[in-house]
Every structure is written in structure tokens, then in C-alpha cells.
């Protein structure tokens, strides 16, 4: 059975299918994580966008295996061929993100660690990635948030997130 889902990332970002798919098929899918993300990918479905039901009995669809073995901030996007693409925060302090693919949201490709900030030696993290398909350019776009040590010092005084109990201030910027 085929489902037409509007994919919604944990931050509420609409990823890639557009309103026509919702009108035609009337379903929403929400990707989320529990706790610190050790449990993996969770999905919930809704017919109206207001009432949500956890799928798979609330159990994870995919356990994290790469990076720091976390799956935080999962974002799904369905490509034009019907394949689902998943990106996620895979650790608190590494320079990459997780990536996996699925045709049915049950069977997944091997997970990949994508070192998106390896070219920046001072990069402290790669968090909250989002993926979308740009139909006009016929390509996927992935963007995320990273802090690069000692970059943008003029805004550090404004504060920011702290990494755990280290006291290190994260001065995030968006990269793609």
C-alpha cells in the first residue's frame, strides 16, 4: 500500500512534499526523538495535524549506529522517486551528521556518518540538520547548525547554548 505523507521535522520544518500531497492523501507524518536520542527514530501520524498517534507502538523505527550513537532532531524528506531520506544530529560534539534512506520507513539503508564540518578544524558540532528537495534544481539540500571555535566573537557576549556542563558557549550559525 502506498501512502502520501507530508514529512514534518522535529522543529516543525515542512520537508518537501507540499500542500497538494496533503490535500490529495490527507495524512501527516512527524519524526521525533525521545530523551537524549539514544533510542532512535520515532514517528507519529495525523489525519488533521492536531491529533497525533505514535506509530510502531511508540517503539523506534531505526536505532542510531553512527557518530555518538544518538539520533536527535530527525528530519525526513521524500524524494521524487519515493525514497525517504533521513538526516539527524548524531552526537553532541562531532563534526558530522547521520544519513540513511528507506523506501518504506521500515527497512533502512546502512547508516552513514557525513563529516559536513570536517573542513573546519575549529568546528565543535553539527546539530539539527534539515533536508529538503529543491525540484527546480533537481537536488537535495541539507543544512545544519554549527559552532566554530573563536569565530564570530562579537556575538558571544549575547550568550548562547552551553554544551552540557562544560560551560562552552555554542555560537551557532547555519551551514549547507
Kindly label every feature range from the protein language model:
Residues 5-16:
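Bacterial N-terminal signal peptides
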Amino acid at each position: 500500500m502506498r501512502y502520501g505523507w507530508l514529512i514534518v521535522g522535529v522543529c516543525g520544518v515542512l520537508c518537501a512534499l507540499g500542500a497538494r500531497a496533503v490535500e490529495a492523501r490527507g495524512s501527516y507524518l512527524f519524526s521525533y526523538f525521545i530523551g537524549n536520542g539514544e533510542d532512535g527514530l520515532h514517528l507519529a501520524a495525523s489525519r488533521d495535524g492536531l491529533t497525533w498517534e505514535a506509530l510502531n507502538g511508540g517503539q523506534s523505527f531505526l536505532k542510531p549506529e553512527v557518530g555518538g550513537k544518538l539520533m536527535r532532531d530527525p528530519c525526513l524528506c521524500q524524494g521524487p522517486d519515493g525514497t525517504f531520506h533521513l538526516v539527524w544530529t548524531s552526537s553532541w560534539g562531532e563534526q558530522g551528521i547521520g544519513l540513511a534512506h528507506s523506501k518504506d520507513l521500515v527497512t533502512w539503508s546502512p547508516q552513514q556518518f557525513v563529516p559536513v564540518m570536517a573542513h573546519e578544524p575549529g568546528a565543535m558540532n553539527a546539530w539539527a540538520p534539515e533536508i529538503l528537495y529543491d525540484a527546480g534544481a533537481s537536488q537535495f539540500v541539507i543544512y545544519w547548525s554549527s559552532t566554530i571555535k573563536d569565530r564570530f566573537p562579537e556575538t558571544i557576549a549575547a550568550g548562547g547554548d552551553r554544551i552540557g556542563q562544560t560551560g562552552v558557549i555554542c555560537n551557532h550559525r547555519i551551514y549547507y
